[in-house]
Amino acid sequence: MRGFFVTGTDTEVGKTVISSGLAALLKDNNRHVGVYKPFLSGISRHHPDSDTSLLKDMSQTSLSHEDITPFAFKAPLAPYVAGKLEGKTVTMEEVLSHWGRIREKHECFIVEGAGGISVPLGEDYLVSHVIKALQLPMIIVARPRLGTINHTFLTVKYAESMGLPIAGIIINGISDSPDEDEKTNPEMIERLCGVPILGVTPKLANVTKETVLHMVKDHINLSLLMNQVGV
């Protein structure tokens, strides 16, 4: 299976904006792209503002909301914690079984995780274990500001310790008037981590299909990305 797994150095770093934008960009380049975000917490998958809805709209996939996100919980917490509150536990086998049912419906897939790669999804597995099982290269979405060097470095080193391939890093949310840390962090992260920076993307005032697509077109190196992940 061709594609990649989008994770982050933290929650709310812009994984879904980047994932959906890349899906739209691949679609724009005549790729038959699917999306899979197995876990969602804190909002209905059918809500127009949900991550699932944005991924579906931007990728133009025929997959249903339930196909894209089979496991949804009410509380805005880590999936394992939110699931326990509802008396639901999702096993790794269930995640992979659902993946097996949808993976052949598209030529390539963008899979999005929940939070960072150490977030617990079930009783005995983390996001990192799902990435390893799917055997897709990772794209790490990171913050631009102070502290991101440490967060990104730790994410990269943990991924490497798990034997997870990393396609690259996207620094998301640069302000209109970047501070010195925002200007210097991308180069420092690339040098310390030994992983290519695929793009540095601005903070969007309004998230729409048009603004997200323009953002990824203008600020992400698509040719480098496609070479890295084989799509």
Curated annotation (Swiss-Prot):
Keywords: ATP-binding, Biotin biosynthesis, Cytoplasm, Ligase, Magnesium, Metal-binding, Nucleotide-binding
Names of required cofactors: Mg(2+)
Gene Ontology CC entries for this record: cytosol
Reactions that this protein is recorded to catalyse: (7R,8S)-7,8-diammoniononanoate + CO2 + ATP = (4R,5S)-dethiobiotin + ADP + phosphate + 3 H(+)
Family annotation (SUPFAM superfamilies): P-loop containing nucleoside triphosphate hydrolases
Domain of life: Bacteria
Pathway entry: Cofactor biosynthesis; biotin biosynthesis; biotin from 7,8-diaminononanoate: step 1/2
Top EC class, one word: ligase
GO MF term (any one): ATP binding
The protein's Enzyme Commission number: 6.3.3.3
Sequence positions that bind Mg(2+): T16, D51, E112
Binding, ATP: E12, V13, G14, K15, T16, V17, D51, E112, G113, A114, G115, P202, K203, L204
Active site: K37
Database matches in InterPro entries: DTB_synth_BioD, P-loop_NTPase
GO terms, biological process: biotin biosynthetic process
Residues that coordinate or bind substrate: S41
Pfam family, one: AAA_26
Main localization, broad class: cytoplasm
Assembly: Homodimer.
Primary role: Catalyzes a mechanistically unusual reaction, the ATP-dependent insertion of CO2 between the N7 and N8 nitrogen atoms of 7,8-diaminopelargonic acid (DAPA, also called 7,8-diammoniononanoate) to form a ureido ring.
Family, similarity comment: Belongs to the dethiobiotin synthetase family.
PANTHER family, per the entry: ATP-DEPENDENT DETHIOBIOTIN SYNTHETASE BIOD 2 (PTHR43210:SF2), DETHIOBIOTIN SYNTHETASE (PTHR43210)
Protein name: ATP-dependent dethiobiotin synthetase BioD
Species whose genome carries this gene: Bacillus subtilis (strain 168)
Encoding gene per record: bioD
